[in-house]
């Protein structure tokens, strides 16, 4: 699960943390636990988050 270097705080639309799996579904990018308002948990390997601006916009 590669952490995107362009991740910015405050642009998270939704997120979830994973324990075993390290693959983020389509539309989500990997992010460090410190980038999300989530209590530190050593059981978590990381988080997947959907960011504002990364969602594909419908073509007009």
Swiss-Prot record:
Lineage of the species this protein comes from: Eukaryota, Metazoa, Ecdysozoa, Arthropoda, Myriapoda
Listed GO MF terms: toxin activity
Superkingdom, taxonomy of origin: Eukaryota
Tissue expression summary: Expressed by the venom gland.
Primary location class: secreted
A cellular-component GO term for this protein: extracellular region
Post-translational modification: Contains 3 disulfide bonds.
Subcellular location: Secreted
Stated family: Belongs to the scutigerotoxin-02 family.
The name this protein goes by in its record: U-scutigerotoxin(02)-Tl4a
Keywords for this protein: Disulfide bond, Secreted, Signal, Toxin
